[in-house]
UniProtKB/Swiss-Prot annotation:
GO terms for cellular component: cytosol. Belongs to the UPF0246 family. This is UPF0246 protein Asuc_0575. GO terms for biological process: response to hydroperoxide. It holds the Pfam family H2O2_YaaD.
Length: 258
């Protein structure tokens, strides 16, 4: 079983991290191609492309300039400890044990606009490049065209290594769009998290993001290796609702204070 999650815009390269054996990202040849394209852009062009402030555009231009294909613990850190944000608040990697992280290394992948697909212990340098960015390359008009085949093949390879065919989609729609389901020999299940508010159940973005992280954590800490076990997920107060779930979409509901 393999779960995929989105990355985060917020990064942390200051706090202490556990001393674990890190790994090299697997797709840096492609990352280098994107870096080469981004280095040709001015800060103003980066700001326009990414819809960010002049300050952030300058920071990203500097990061593209500083990026090195060789990753080490001086210029990078393990991806699972670098990402911060709602999903990663739910995941709470800092409280996971070394054994948990090793399980995650085989069962969790992070989609990335620059790195394509990251394992938890893969080294990652600071960057910002969202998957929806319309960055034109020799492969097409945007990152979906650049990464689609590559990421899908990488996911298939990871599933083949496990001898399993179940993919849990815990990524946002923006990031999952890069995956080509028709080219995966896999059963894909998308958990949907609904909160009861103002008289009805609906997806509330902040809560849904955190819930994706919570389910990732549950999968890791409970050593989930069979899809049916995920129906017992109850972190954060969510409960599986069989009556509204389908084979492809599993619905988890929660009542929150009005």
């Amino acid at each position: 079983m393999l779960a995929i999650i989105s990355p985060a815009k917020t990064l942390d390269y200051q706090s202490a991290v556990p001393k674990l054996a890190v790994t090299q990202p697997l797709l840096t040849d492609y990352s280098q191609q994107l870096i080469d394209v981004c280095r040709q852009l001015t800060p103003a062009e980066i700001g326009s492309l990414m819809s960010v402030s002049d300050k952030l555009a300058g920071l990203n231009a500097a990061r593209f300039a500083d990026w090195q294909k060789e990753h080490n613990e001086q210029n990078a850190r393990a991806a699972i400890y670098a990402f911060r944000g709602d999903v990663y608040t739910g995941l709470d990697a800092d409280s996971l044990t070394a054994e948990d992280i090793q399980f995650a290394q085989s069962h969790l992948r992070m989609l990335s606009g620059l790195y394509g697909l990251l394992r938890p212990l893969d080294l990652m340098q600071p960057y910002r490049l969202e998957m929806s960015t319309k960055l034109a390359t020799a492969k097409g008009k945007d990152l979906y065209q650049f990464w689609g085949e590559i990421i899908t093949e990488s996911l298939q390879n990871a599933l083949d290594e496990q001898g399993d065919d179940v993919l849990i989609n815990l990524a946002s729609d923006e990031y999952y769009k890069v995956v080509k389901p028709s080219k995966l020999q896999a059963r894909i299940v998308k958990p949907v998290f609904l909160d009861h508010k103002n008289g009805k159940y609906k997806v509330i973005s902040f809560y849904a993001k955190k819930a994706r992280g919570l389910m990732s954590r549950y999968l890791i800490t409970q050593r989930i290796n069979r899809i049916e076990q995920l129906k017992h997920f109850n972190l954060g107060g969510y409960q599986f609702d069989d009556s509204v779930s389908t084979e492809r979409e599993w619905v988890f509901k929660r009542d929150i204070s009005e």
